[in-house]
Amino acid sequence: MDVKVITRHSPSNFGSLLQSIATVHVIERLGHQCEIIDYQRKDERGLKGVLTQLNCKGSYGNPLKRLAYIAIRYPIEKFAQVKFDRMRKCYLKMTKRCSSHKDLAKLSADAFMTGSDQVWGPMMNGYYDSAYFLQFAQDNVRKLAYAASFGKTKFDASTVADYKKMLASYDKIAVREKSAVVMLDEWGLENYVGQVLDPTLLLDKSEWMNLIIKKNDLVKYKDKNYILVYQIHNDPKLSDYAKRLAKHSGMELVRVNPMLHQILRGGKFIFCPDLSEFLSLIANALCIVTDSFHGTCFSINFGKQFIEILPNNATGTRNQSILELTGLSDRILCDFNDYSLVDKVIDYGKVNELLEVERRKSLEVIRSMIQNSSFIKQ
């Protein structure tokens, strides 16, 4: 079967790309053909992307501030975009570039799938995009969603009405967060099959090591005594805590990020590395401090000691969801003067048992979903 997946693969961040790679790998392993639809909105790339971000920031009304923001932000965004475009071409199977709904309507497949990440939430411009609800797909084609996420838990009445209509056209829906299951149930949708794992967790550590990680990158960071910071939100408290934690524990602080401005936040800065080096940094870290959902997923999947700092916005529900699922809610930092979590060792025997059960269930969902088997709600 030919399966084409639309997901948020194009942002310049590691999680978006890694979950896309995992989705293709899993579907191919099930014996099907799979490609990521290379849908890249023009208002999210290059200078237009920076202007879109700027227009959503109400604090930049002053023309000089706007020019300064563009002058600083555009080169950073452009460099990261070039790097990630190169990685996408190297690691990801994609269709030809689609920049509009008209382009998407020309695609053909046996099944279209909405993939993971925050596909059903607002885009950079603040509005949802019906393309991620498969509104371009022909009526006679199967419409599926695996590990889709809303990115938030509250929508206005008009948006809910639109969502209910678009989601009702799907054959089967599986979502990533518990909060999404609650919403679908409240909206009266009957075509959802429950909560599933993020695609990155469908592959275990050894599979990721074989698929992505190069030996020279793994050796490069072996036996290094460091705390790794993977931060995606602008939270000065996180940056300050990580510096104090490293000093308290006597470990080196290493920070990895695709955005150059994080060089100012402390620690040895590794700027926009290849996926192999990124995963090697996680694999070798003694402890990880993160506010990132995928940073959390890979910390758990690689059996690492980690400290979770929830972001100060609605997106934190996805982090909480995977922590609850694996029994690791106690890794959430509640006090920025508390350094005890770095010494509190996680029992990964129990965690891996829970994760393996959920992995098997999720793999069965995606297998049955594509093969058009019957479902029972989980």
List PLM regions with ranges.
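Leloir-type glycosyltransferase catalytic cores
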Residues: 325-378
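Short beta-strand scaffold positions
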Residues: 114, 175, 289-290
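Aromatic- and Gly/Pro-rich donor/ligand-binding loops
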Residues: 3-14, 18-165, 213-214
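A nucleotide-sugar donor-handling region in carbohydrate enzymes
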Residues: 94-106, 120-126, 147-225, 231-232
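Charged active-site motifs of nucleotide-sugar-dependent glycosyltransferases
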Residues: 2, 142, 222-227, 251-252
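A donor-sugar binding/catalytic signature common to diverse glycosyltransferases
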Residues: 281-321
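Donor nucleotide-activated moiety binding/catalytic core segment of transferases
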Residues: 193-201, 205, 258-259, 263-291
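Catalytic donor nucleotide-activated moiety binding site of glycosyltransferases and closely related
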Residues: 145-151, 183, 232-233, 237-274, ...
